[in-house]
């Protein structure tokens, strides 16, 4: 799990979720807010997704957040 700030000063957490068929989702939740966003990661497996998340800077997380869709 990673915490970061968006360009408006909002505080977010990003976490990984193993989905069906080997897919990995990046899940975003705003700290103190409601709703959850998700984005499928283009990684081969969960381990690779963990490495991506650990190595991503805040700019990469903000870019993924901008591409994320509401859950549900």
Question: Where are these predicted regions, by residue range?
Answer:
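Residue-level signal for well-ordered alpha-helical segments
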Residues: 3-5, 30, 38, 42
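Intrinsically disordered, low-complexity regions enriched in Ser/Pro/Gly/Gln/His and often acidic
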Residues: 4-5, 21, 45, 64
């Amino acid at each position: 799990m990673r915490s970061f700030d968006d360009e408006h000063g909002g505080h977010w957490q990003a976490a990984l979720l193993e989905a069906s068929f080997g897919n990995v989702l990046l899940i975003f939740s705003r700290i103190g807010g409601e709703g959850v966003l998700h984005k499928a990661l283009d990684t081969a497996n969960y381990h690779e997704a963990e490495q991506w998340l650990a190595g991503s800077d805040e700019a990469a997380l903000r870019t993924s957040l901008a591409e994320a869709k509401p859950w549900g």
